[in-house]
């Protein structure tokens, strides 16, 4: 007790570190038992004092920070502004993410700093404050989450979730915030489930690789070592890391201090020796590691070093491989449960700022900086060297030096206020270790077409793919528009650039009742579907054999045609969509009330785009004389017929082509044999029998009666019964062969009596034609049915007079019309309608043609449009047909590999490749197209085949206007000389994207100069022109051309041959408002005129005199180096990958991010998303070594150096991840694993070797030994195997088969005749033998051969020096022949100087 006076009294606060130090010293001095007694006393003292102070923790002790509300509001405001910038396309997704994270991180940090002063001011003895800030329990981060805000969280992949948790745990979390918390918090629900399995599998693979590694010898006799130096050129190795690396190792060489030896070779290093080495600051120390052990499948005691359990050299028979695998895998399993209670809360760093010392004007040298973008997307200047910035105040000048690689955020001569941020210093080099390069994919928010506003290069390795690299900052645009993917059964109403009407045909998948099947399905290949009309009359369908369906009335207006011969007075315009165009029948109102779609009257057939080819049918007329109310069979006498097949009638369905011909008559008679047809479902109850004879008005079913009498024939057809009633006379002739000779023939009147006698046994003359048909009932005698025949006389087709007068400029190009009759049904085919619908047999067509004499004419097509002319209050509608010289061609903006260079309109490119054939298969018609007005564009893929329809609907347009202050000056008004009696033709203006408007939308307002004048004498005057329908007036040019919409009075120069629009160049406006060019892309919030509206982002589609129409588009900013997916003009769907950025982000300090990294390194996956040319560097190094040393040495040394370097860097990478988590793993465990995955080489084809096959994987040591034994050069190169591949490339096939791919491994082993020597643990466990470790280890070990110790003076070598020298020693004989017989230090030194420049340190 007397010694107490001499004890030193410390009055200090003890934290955790000090307690640890105290305990360790107590144990050293007093031992374990006494120390535990002391610690008990300390614990009791603490509890006593806590009770005396009455510290308790209640929820009221958690005081929230008052400034939190406005701090969060401020951050939200900044986030909102950032979101708007992103929407406008000013920043891209990465910059937005970075800035968002930094905004919230700064807010969270500021709150954390406010916390301590807040406690101190309000309640200094708050228990939370006392506990956390004294370091007794908890830390600032946890208290911050309790009373500040939880802030940003990391997800299981370690990615930042940019939605911060604004609440703290005192206030409670919302549902979304709680779910985000589940990702992070300790034992997080999401995390534990996902991660534990990963860590377990990692451990399994690691153990699999190294399970056979056992300590089998004391010394392998190696002379190699790895040098470890406490100081390095780059940076000092910390003492802790240095001592950890050395303790427990064995020296590979003696250590000298001057002349005196401090330690000798093969001595194990303890803590005392390490301390002496650190104190003496010796040079590099060479140590033995598992890498230097000369064995292949085991390890020796000296290369392994001390056992981690009892601190002595490892025992023989120790299973060090399994220990190593578990040492690396186990921390992963533990650390998945995030040891710290901070719970995945993000920690990062913000950049350092330079602020202005006072108010003043900025001055700096602009030549030393160049403009750039900061990582948040703000404009800035980057200075490459030290930059002096002068701030000129009123009375003082400040000089601020900005370090290199910093961002200057202000401009020259800008006025700054005091404390304003003027520069941002780039984070120092030390933070670079915590950065990693990652990929970020940006996905499209909407569907539409992709465009970009700059050139894009193909990525070199993907020359033929759709991956492009951006050379400079630009916008990617997604132009909105709905799309429908085409399928086998699709509906070809539309071609490229067509307009769709609101009422255009929408075909939907419908179930078709059996009543709506028609008899002539087989003939036409169509299947009819119920339209809106037939729904009103249940069970009936309108029988139109070649129509695809009905449409609503588009508009009603009185229409007349040009030619008076085909004029039909008082008719209404009812239009119907057909596959190849519009159908506009002219019919009287009375008929319209009787029937929905009359069969008489003139129908004009106009293609969808108003363009006719040669021999197109312009109009047709259904003559009432050729109409029948009943079904029947058509026949004709074949004087000659050829079928007209139109392009559009070719129907393709799953590769089958059905051609529906229209038979053009050269005959004068058509015969129609009537019959009554009914189709019933199979379940119907029929009251008549097959082959029975019934009278008129006989009841067939409960509610159907026959209209004619005659013979009943029934036939089963696809799910129903077809019942036919043949009227006529029945005869029973005597001789069967005479019947068969005359069966199925038409017999004319006035024929010979004898012939008739045989057939009919009647002698009186016939007044009409008859049809003889033989009927054979099943059991009864055959008889002949003589059926009445209706005959029709048909007039031949005639050519109408040419409508146009001879044109002085081009005499040949004139319109001609031909009247053609054709029969709608084939010869002998059944033409039938159900119940009482009527049937048209013959149709009269008006065929359009021109310049038949001149084959070389360039006019391929004509355009049709309607013109309305008013004379004296009477309105006449004319169909106007324009000749178009040459093809209309659409050029895309850029001839891109994907794009459709030039698509001609005359059929070849488009018609043949258009998959939108009209097909009505058994499943009905696919899906409806859009039912709203829009422009259709067909997008082409690489092979110029159509893939997708894109539909621009009205919802994708914005109409902005009016722009009052856009003025046009000096427009030249050119007048056309107009005679009083002449009519200037009026051209329908072009619609969006160079298309013709459909009939419902055509208009005509401007006068055009054309070459064809049509003279209509004394018919009307020019002033009375008016547009029939009120629609937008607009003009459109190609994306680069200029746009100019003239006044209503001015004239437009139009070249009708190629449809390029030439506008008179307008002078610019007096105001500085720009003239918008068509196809131009505008970002949102841009004002095109001073007082104009703010535009939405999009592409200028239509420019009018006082308004502009913009197709809405979404801009995405992309910076150089980004990868763009997809082609220019390609279609993207929502969620498709649009662009990939590669950026650096700071690593999150958490093991859950570490585990994937460890796995990546061990599985040897590429760490960076884009290889940093590492492979090329290794290849170049190998090539240069080969060049210097020749072939044999080059491969040998190149492979060895590659392996040594890669081993060291792998160990360092894995250690870095674990150390960042505070997990201490001894290097030797990692080295054993890394040795296994780097111990194989790949035999290459460069040298012809008779020992191994090219591409074979062999052990490095085996390759060296074989080369030495056979004195033959084996060429090989180093290869890194991942742990999975290494497990499947061992010497034991039983071990491989028990890991993965059992069948494949065993089959290969059987084919190769492999032998398993059962050296490892696993194969013995599988077969139930004694495992060769511990007590089962066979002590019969051969004495290692004593190597001649070659004493050489050690160089102060770095790693490469030591390694290279050892390589040379191993291959002495070869080396002698290569260089010289004497091996001097100098020669070695000189030889190595050139190669050994890079240094490496190892820890």
From Swiss-Prot:
<dbReference type="GO" id="GO:0003677">
    <property type="term" value="F:DNA binding"/>
</dbReference>
<comment type="subunit">
    <text>In plastids the minimal PEP RNA polymerase catalytic core is composed of four subunits: alpha, beta, beta', and beta''. When a (nuclear-encoded) sigma factor is associated with the core the holoenzyme is formed, which can initiate transcription.</text>
</comment>
<comment type="function">
    <text>DNA-dependent RNA polymerase catalyzes the transcription of DNA into RNA using the four ribonucleoside triphosphates as substrates.</text>
</comment>
<feature type="binding site">
    <location>
        <position position="220"/>
    </location>
    <ligand>
        <name>Zn(2+)</name>
    </ligand>
</feature>
<dbReference type="GO" id="GO:0006351">
    <property type="term" value="P:DNA-templated transcription"/>
</dbReference>
<keyword id="KW-0240">DNA-directed RNA polymerase</keyword>
<keyword id="KW-0934">Plastid</keyword>
<feature type="binding site">
    <location>
        <position position="303"/>
    </location>
    <ligand>
        <name>Zn(2+)</name>
    </ligand>
</feature>
<dbReference type="InterPro" id="IPR038120">
    <property type="entry name" value="Rpb1_funnel_sf"/>
</dbReference>
<keyword id="KW-0150">Chloroplast</keyword>
<dbReference type="GO" id="GO:0008270">
    <property type="term" value="F:zinc ion binding"/>
</dbReference>
<dbReference type="InterPro" id="IPR007083">
    <property type="entry name" value="RNA_pol_Rpb1_4"/>
</dbReference>
<feature type="binding site">
    <location>
        <position position="300"/>
    </location>
    <ligand>
        <name>Zn(2+)</name>
    </ligand>
</feature>
<dbReference type="GO" id="GO:0003899">
    <property type="term" value="F:DNA-directed RNA polymerase activity"/>
</dbReference>
<dbReference type="GO" id="GO:0009507">
    <property type="term" value="C:chloroplast"/>
</dbReference>
<dbReference type="InterPro" id="IPR007081">
    <property type="entry name" value="RNA_pol_Rpb1_5"/>
</dbReference>
<feature type="binding site">
    <location>
        <position position="293"/>
    </location>
    <ligand>
        <name>Zn(2+)</name>
    </ligand>
</feature>
<dbReference type="GO" id="GO:0005739">
    <property type="term" value="C:mitochondrion"/>
</dbReference>
<dbReference type="GO" id="GO:0000428">
    <property type="term" value="C:DNA-directed RNA polymerase complex"/>
</dbReference>
<comment type="similarity">
    <text>Belongs to the RNA polymerase beta' chain family. RpoC2 subfamily.</text>
</comment>
<keyword id="KW-0479">Metal-binding</keyword>
<dbReference type="InterPro" id="IPR012756">
    <property type="entry name" value="DNA-dir_RpoC2_beta_pp"/>
</dbReference>
<keyword id="KW-0804">Transcription</keyword>
<keyword id="KW-0862">Zinc</keyword>
<dbReference type="InterPro" id="IPR050254">
    <property type="entry name" value="RNA_pol_beta''_euk"/>
</dbReference>
<keyword id="KW-0808">Transferase</keyword>
<dbReference type="Pfam" id="PF04998">
    <property type="entry name" value="RNA_pol_Rpb1_5"/>
</dbReference>
<keyword id="KW-0548">Nucleotidyltransferase</keyword>
<dbReference type="InterPro" id="IPR042102">
    <property type="entry name" value="RNA_pol_Rpb1_3_sf"/>
</dbReference>
<dbReference type="Pfam" id="PF05000">
    <property type="entry name" value="RNA_pol_Rpb1_4"/>
</dbReference>
<protein>
    <recommendedName>
        <fullName>DNA-directed RNA polymerase subunit beta''</fullName>
        <ecNumber>2.7.7.6</ecNumber>
    </recommendedName>
</protein>
